[in-house]
């Protein structure tokens, strides 16, 4: 009796606890058959996933979707009304009268529906969120699935979700499609899909480029994809099958499910697997494809191999040569290679030895293979006896692979891979032939004779030029001598172009070849007779850049050799004409991309971060690592050119100043540069140093990150205001914002603010900037308020601003703030 009495309070408390727990669990339900308004959700049985309404980052639109419930970072894995957002909180998720799951807005318009043809009623169907993340609509009486979200994925691939085609799906193709951007879940530019014939392969396609292939996994052999040799069964793909009816599906599972992982196709076309870190309370990058340049589909063109561990990555297969040698040497490998010698089987006569095969090891198999079940010896004979066969391979699970068309997308792998045998003419294997030695000797002698003739001809031409140009040529060489230390020998390698040569190259400076208008005159695209593409800057007489600026640029650039500096090919002096000839930059200038919403999407964050690093490396070379110490004085987005691979190159050295080794700063009465990029001590006092270039660098960094121009320093004020609020989302270009890179973006904003501080001494050197960018744990000081240019700084500054108002659109350089 006493025992019963003593336990009664405990039993009572436990009963109440169970009651409230049951109420709580009832509220956190996994299924529903009625309605969910904007503030209501359902959660999976073990609380891994939640379904309801959400808003993406930097957006107020409302979408019905599924996201991870147990982590603080919003990570959406499926969206219902991805094309039809709701702009307020009036949305409702419900079971309609015909038994379908629907999303409606405040006016009861159906924005999305499962659209299942069923005779079920609203009372006989229920929606349930499974612990797998699969949202299902099922018959309440039989539990049969009528519809499931796993058959209609958006950008995420979850464990046990099928990708491909299968009898279960009614023959439909199940693909993964990226979001448009982090703020817009509507279908984006990229799709990942499983392609079955002749071998199952995973592909990423660019929807905006006629479904062009971006990446392929290589063929599947029953255990792994050939192009993903480091991915072993269990870690990435758990099972895969091809059904008898030629429909197939891939399903993925992780070997260790103790760590939360998310595999998705991001809006830039990368398939990314990220892992949740409890220590960091954020996602960390696990792996991604494409991971290297060689992963990009057909990066090197046909008949090539791509090796990410070599520089350059691309090389022609033995027996082949570049299709366009000039383009190839300039790093444009898209044209690929062509065969050096015809195959014996292609010759009209049968004289000569039979073709042979070159074996390449550890290869990712090229695209477009044909499949055969022949044995390895039979595979070899089949290829040898067919002149249309250009390569073959044989491997466990693959059988015999035959190629009858160009070999594209071949890659040298670090591990695993297969042997690929390439058909070549027999003469390609003659290593003991003495003819190469004889040819080499003759060639060397020929080169010597030609070189001698060229030198003699050059001397004669130079003498004729001197007579023809008279005063102009002599004048420029006198200036060159003064700047180059009194020796013309230092500039002998820099050619002087004839005016007619450049006129012909640019089609008489036609408008169709005009690339743009700089502060010193128009720039034209041209092509020399030997096929070299060039950019010609034709200096206008009204530009203010006279002989001094031209000579400065000739001297400065001719002495500099760096990956991130534009290359100068030569110049032209003819009467009143002054022209500079540069290497042609096919991707134009940085401002063309970051300030144009249509082009900005081409530069994702990884690309922009590489551009930032490249600019810093180029500037570090100017300030510290070159033979001369050079202050650029006109560093801005329009003076950062991009080559074919989007590698940045600093250009326009007409305003540069060469510093003696024992000087740190200088003063000038002639303030030159571009408003918005000029440091305050330079704009108002004419004092310039390395730190004035650092200020310009900071402005460029903020423009790259924000996608906005620094007009009248308003960008600096805007960024500083948001920075003080502890957020960066409002200052970052939506095209690049991704929580995956938020830490790195924040660090770059931090560094940029240090670069634009008011006092030059507070700004870091470029070497310090490079160190902070490359360091993960750098102790970066807190920035002070940046320099906001005041309005009333005297007549000269007002004149400077008036020029800048006109120049802000065209990026015209201010050449003199004291009127001419």
Swiss-Prot record:
Q: Where is the Bulb-type lectin domain?
A: 27-150
Q: Which domain of life is it from?
A: Eukaryota
Compartment(s) where it occurs, according to its Swiss-Prot or TrEMBL record: Cell membrane
List the ranges whose topology is Extracellular. 27-436
User: Which cysteines in this chain are paired by disulphide bridges?
Assistant: 294-306, 300-314, 379-400, 383-389
Q: Where is the PAN domain?
A: 345-425
Which N-terminal residues, if any, form the signal peptide?
Answer: 1-26
Keyword Transcription regulation annotated: no
Where in the numbering of this chain does the EGF-like domain appear?
290-326
- Residues reported to bind ATP: 515-523, 537
Q: What is its main location?
A: membrane
As one GO molecular function, the record gives:
ATP binding
Tell me the protein family, please.
Belongs to the protein kinase superfamily. Ser/Thr protein kinase family.
Instruction: Please give the name of this protein.
Output: G-type lectin S-receptor-like serine/threonine-protein kinase At1g11303
């Amino acid at each position: 009796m006493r025992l019963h009495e003593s336990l009664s309070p405990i039993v009572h408390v436990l009963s109440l606890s169970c009651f409230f727990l049951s109420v709580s669990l009832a509220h956190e339900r996994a299924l529903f058959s009625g309605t969910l308004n904007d503030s209501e959700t359902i959660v999976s049985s073990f609380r891994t996933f939640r379904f309801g309404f959400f808003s993406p980052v930097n957006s107020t639109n409302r979408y019905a979707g599924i996201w991870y419930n147990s982590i603080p970072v919003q990570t959406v894995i499926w969206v219902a009304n991805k094309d039809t957002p709701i702009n307020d909180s009036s949305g409702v998720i419900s079971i309609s009268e015909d038994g379908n799951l629907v999303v409606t807005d405040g006016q009861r318009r159906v924005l999305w529906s499962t659209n299942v043809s069923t005779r079920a009623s609203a009372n006989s169907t229920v929606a349930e969120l499974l612990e797998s993340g699969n949202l299902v609509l099922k018959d309440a009486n039989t539990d049969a699935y009528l519809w499931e979200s796993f058959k209609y994925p958006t950008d995420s691939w979850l464990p046990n979700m099928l990708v491909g085609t299968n009898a279960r799906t009614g023959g439909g193709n199940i693909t993964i499609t990226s979001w448009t951007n982090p703020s817009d879940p509507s279908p984006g530019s990229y799709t990942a899909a499983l392609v079955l014939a002749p071998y199952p392969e995973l592909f990423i396609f660019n929807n905006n480029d006629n479904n062009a292939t971006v990446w392929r996994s290589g063929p599947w052999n029953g255990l792994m994809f050939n192009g993903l040799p480091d991915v072993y069964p269990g870690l990435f793909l758990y099972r895969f099958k091809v059904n008898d009816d030629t429909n197939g599906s891939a399903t993925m599972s992780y070997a260790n499910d103790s760590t939360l992982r998310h595999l998705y196709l991001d809006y830039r076309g990368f398939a990314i697997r990220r892992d949740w870190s409890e220590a960091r309370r954020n996602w960390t990058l696990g792996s991604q494809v494409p991971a290297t340049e060689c992963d990009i589909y057909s990066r090197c063109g046909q008949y090539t191999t791509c090796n990410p561990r070599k520089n350059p990555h691309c090389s022609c297969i033995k027996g082949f040569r570049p299709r366009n040698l000039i383009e190839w040497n300039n790093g444009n490998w898209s044209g690929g290679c062509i065969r050096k010698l015809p195959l014996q089987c292609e010759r009209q006569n049968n004289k000569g030895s039979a073709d042979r095969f070159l074996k390449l090891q550890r290869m990712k198999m090229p695209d477009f293979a044909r499949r055969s079940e022949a044995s390895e010896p039979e595979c070899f004979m089949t290829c040898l006896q067919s002149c249309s066969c250009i390569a073959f391979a044989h491997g466990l699970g693959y059988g015999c692979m035959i190629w009858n068309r160009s070999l594209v997308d071949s890659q040298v792998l670090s591990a695993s891979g297969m042997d690929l045998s390439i058909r070549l003419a027999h003469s390609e294997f003659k290593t003991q032939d003495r003819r190469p030695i004889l040819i080499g000797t003759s060639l060397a002698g020929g080169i010597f004779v030609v070189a001698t003739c060229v030198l003699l001809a050059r001397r004669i031409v130079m003498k004729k030029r001197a007579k023809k140009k008279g005063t102009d040529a002599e004048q420029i060489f006198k200036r060159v001598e003064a700047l180059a230390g009194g020796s013309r020998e230092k500039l002998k390698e820099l050619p002087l172009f004839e005016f007619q040569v450049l006129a012909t190259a640019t089609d008489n400076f036609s408008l169709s070849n005009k690339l743009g208008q700089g502060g010193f005159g128009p720039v034209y695209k041209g092509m020399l007779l030997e096929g070299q593409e060039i950019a010609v800057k034709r200096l206008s007489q009204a530009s203010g850049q006279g002989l001094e600026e031209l000579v400065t640029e000739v001297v400065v650039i001719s002495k500099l050799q760096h990956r991130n500096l534009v290359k100068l090919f030569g110049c032209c002096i003819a009467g009143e004409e002054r022209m500079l000839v540069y290497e042609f930059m096919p991707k134009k200038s940085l401002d063309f991309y970051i300030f144009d919403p249509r082009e900005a999407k081409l530069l994702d964050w990884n690309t922009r971060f590489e551009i930032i690093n490249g600019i810093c490396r180029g500037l570090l070379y100017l300030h510290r690592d070159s033979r001369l110490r050079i202050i650029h004085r006109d560093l801005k987005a329009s003076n950062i050119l991009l080559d074919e691979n989007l590698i940045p190159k600093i250009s326009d050295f007409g305003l540069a100043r060469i510093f003696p080794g024992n000087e740190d700063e200088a003063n000038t009465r002639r303030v030159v540069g571009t408003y918005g990029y000029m440091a305050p001590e330079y704009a108002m006092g004419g004092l310039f140093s390395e730190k004035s270039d650092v200020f310009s660098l900071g402005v460029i960094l903020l423009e790259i990150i924000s996608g906005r121009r620094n007009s009248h320093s308003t960008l600096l004020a805007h960024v500083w205001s948001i920075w003080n609020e502890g957020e960066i989302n409002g200052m970052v270009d939506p095209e690049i914002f991704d929580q995956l890179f938020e830490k790195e973006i924040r660090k770059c904003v931090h560094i940029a603010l240090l670069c634009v501080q008011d006092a030059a001494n507070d700004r870091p050197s470029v070497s310090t900037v490079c160190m902070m960018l490359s360091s993960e744990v750098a102790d970066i000081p807190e920035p002070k308020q940046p320099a906001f240019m005041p309005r009333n700084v005297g007549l000269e500054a007002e004149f400077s601003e008036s020029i800048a108002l006109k120049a802000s659109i065209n990026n015209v350089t201010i050449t003199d703030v004291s009127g001419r």
